[in-house]
Amino acid sequence: MKRNSYIFISLLLSVVLFTSCITEDEYDNSPEGNFEALWQTIDRQYCFLDYKKQEYGLDWNEIYSQYKQRISKGMNNEQLFEVLADMLNELRDGHVNLSSKLEYSQYREWFDSYPANFSDSIQRVYLGKDYAQSSGMKYQIFEDNIAYIYCGSFQSGIGEGNLDEVLNKLAICDGLIIDVRNNSGGNLTTAEKLAARFTNEKVLVGYMSHKTGPGHNDFSTPKAVWLEPSLDRVRWQKQAVVLTNRRSF
């Protein structure tokens, strides 16, 4: 079985398809082959194995021995899916999922074990029925002259003109609430475009590196990530707060 160019790990029938930019390996289309393929993919390409070993003692080699015992030639697709999903959940990573035509596995402990800190019904009350919407953002002005913008996803792009329009409409307000709780994630550039409206100077926001080989420590040299202000666009100059929770991807 070949590794294919997908970000997520997908189980289709008994064939596991997964990402690769390092090598092209062949695995038997069998429970054993699929198990080996998935374990090797994580071992070579997952970024946080050493970090998670330090944080809570994750030993990926021990995980191999533990879950290898649960693999048998006669198991069906549902049984195989369950074992592979359980193995991935050992990573405790809400971004690592396993999917098939009939099932979808996700590490839900990441958010289910903590307060939701978000209520759709309450949000509908303070958004009301007359809220405005632009580029996927819902926005409203509260009675105390505080503006509110909800961004439920960064999957679709946010137009620069749309941001100008929204911020111009809200310019009369004394403050702004940016709500990204339960944001399903999406494009980093979309989030950066929004954040650029809240700074007047270049800001260092972090560092980024990527995997360069199969070793757990094979990473490129960290590269600084800078947030550039949108100097030729409308920028927010008053107080602002951000609401987030553990379901903000």
Question: PLM features: what roles do these ranges have?
Answer:
Residues 246-249:
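Short, intrinsically disordered, charge-balanced linker/junction segments flanking boundaries
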Residues 20-224, 239:
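Flexible, low-complexity junctional segments that flank or bridge functional domains
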Residues 1-28:
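Bacterial Sec-dependent N-terminal signal peptides
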Residues 15, 170-172, 234:
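Alpha-helix termination/capping residues and helix-transition junctions
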Residues 185, 228-236:
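Active-site microenvironments of hydrolase-like enzyme catalytic domains
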